[in-house]
Amino acid sequence: MYKRQALDNAGIVNFGYDRIAYADVKGVKVALIGTYMLAEGLDIKDEMVANINTAKSEGAQIIVVFTHWGIEKETVPGTDQVELGHAAIDAGATLVVGSHPHVIQGYEKYNGRYIVYSLGNFCFGGNKNPSDKDCMIFQQTFTVTGNDVASDDAINVIPCSISSSSSSNNYQPTPAEGDEADRILA
């Protein structure tokens, strides 16, 4: 609770577990919902769907679900990730973004919405020289007209490295270019 209070005191929007964050972005109400799917026996689907329904009832026009899921170093999402991602979209999430595996797991378009399974590490201080420095930035534009949200299919995926140095982690994420960018996105 101390961390939440510190973030609140600093005016930093935070969310997760039992807290949905709302932000006004150019007059559009955006809901940010956090979930955690790593503890054995922890079924978060019902809580996540309830949070999505709460966000909708509170007038959120865009609902982004961030979930901490997956098995470390696995480059392919597990069936539990796919099922939960699909459930989030089916419940009304506009976008699902995952983290935890420490590697890129790619993304899919499901029922007209994107699920990004894992972005990789991006800015990671847990290892001075991780063997996999690949990560990506996922950008998507939404057009809101009244209560209708249209996603722009012209997404932008930017391949990156968590470091500008190949021999160590200097904590300076850097966009990749050329063959390196192609390799990361392959």
Spans of features found by a protein language model:
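Acidic, metal/ion-coordinating pockets
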Residues: 3-186
